[in-house]
């Protein structure tokens, strides 16, 4: 277990570990307990009742948060011809084809999201071992393999985030900054949870939402009352 600093331990004392907080109360506490000198990211960890080893229990998708995440995301688009021009006009940070495939193969990774037109996926697929483990591989499930590149870029820039269950059955997602008003954090949180509930795989058995914890980058985890989230 990592050793926590004095400020973290002081903040952790103010969290009732036996309590399931309502979302607004939890986010108020996250803001109150933030002690870092930078605008911390507010993160949500959702424990799901799925076994990700089974193909019919995968949870992956994307959702546009109404208030964004507070982070400007760099978008790389793999496209050619008219679609490349469309991507540039829509505000993509990088647009190209083979030259960027070569660059990534050599270790360049200065981007947050990758979008590709379907005709480029044969070439982009060669980067699977590099982009896959980083969660950057384009996918039709998250709307990042598409000919509608302008729409994809607009959604990403507006606050579209991707979610994916990890090997432990947990989804980790940033939903804003500590500087956000509580109301905006709650609205982003509700949007995410609605998307996760709708994404429940057919193969999931038993209780689907097993636990929800929120925290700031440096702060302690606060448990949210997940039992009220399932309508």
Swiss-Prot record:
Record keyword Repressor present: yes
InterPro entries, A to Z: Ribosom_uL1_bac-type, Ribosomal_uL1, Ribosomal_uL1-like, Ribosomal_uL1/biogenesis, Ribosomal_uL1_3-a/b-sand, Ribosomal_uL1_CS
Pfam families: Ribosomal_L1
One Gene Ontology term of the molecular function aspect: rRNA binding
GO process annotations (BP): regulation of translation; translation
A GO term from the CC aspect: large ribosomal subunit
Subunit and interaction comment: Part of the 50S ribosomal subunit.
PANTHER family, per the entry: 54S RIBOSOMAL PROTEIN L1, MITOCHONDRIAL (PTHR36427), LARGE RIBOSOMAL SUBUNIT PROTEIN UL1M (PTHR36427:SF3)
HAMAP family named in the record: Ribosomal_uL1_B
Entry function: Binds directly to 23S rRNA. The L1 stalk is quite mobile in the ribosome, and is involved in E site tRNA release. Protein L1 is also a translational repressor protein, it controls the translation of the L11 operon by binding to its mRNA.
Protein name stated in the entry: Large ribosomal subunit protein uL1
Source organism: Carboxydothermus hydrogenoformans (strain ATCC BAA-161 / DSM 6008 / Z-2901)
């Amino acid at each position: 277990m990592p050793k926590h600093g004095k400020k973290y331990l002081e903040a952790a004392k103010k969290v009732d570990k036996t309590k399931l907080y309502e979302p607004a109360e939890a986010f108020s506490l996250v803001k109150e307990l933030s002690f870092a000198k930078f605008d911390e990211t507010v993160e949500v960890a959702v424990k799901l009742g799925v076994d990700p080893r089974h193909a019919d229990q995968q949870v992956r998708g994307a959702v546009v948060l109404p208030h964004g995440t507070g982070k400007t995301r760099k978008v790389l688009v793999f496209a050619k011809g008219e679609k490349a021009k469309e991507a540039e006009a829509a505000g993509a940070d990088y647009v190209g084809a083979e030259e960027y495939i070569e660059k990534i193969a050599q270790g360049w990774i200065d981007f947050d999201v990758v979008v590709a037109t379907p005709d480029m996926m044969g070439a982009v697929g060669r980067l699977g071992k590099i982009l896959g483990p980083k969660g950057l591989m384009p996918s039709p499930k998250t709307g990042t393999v598409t000919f509608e590149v302008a729409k994809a870029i607009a959604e990403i820039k507006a606050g579209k985030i991707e979610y994916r269950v990890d090997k432990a059955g947990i989804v980790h997602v940033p939903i804003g900054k500590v500087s956000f008003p509580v109301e905006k954090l709650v609205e982003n949180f509700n949007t995410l949870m609605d998307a996760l509930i709708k994404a429940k795989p057919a193969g999931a058995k038993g209780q689907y939402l097993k636990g929800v914890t929120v925290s700031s980058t440096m702060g302690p985890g606060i448990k949210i009352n997940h039992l009220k989230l399932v309508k």
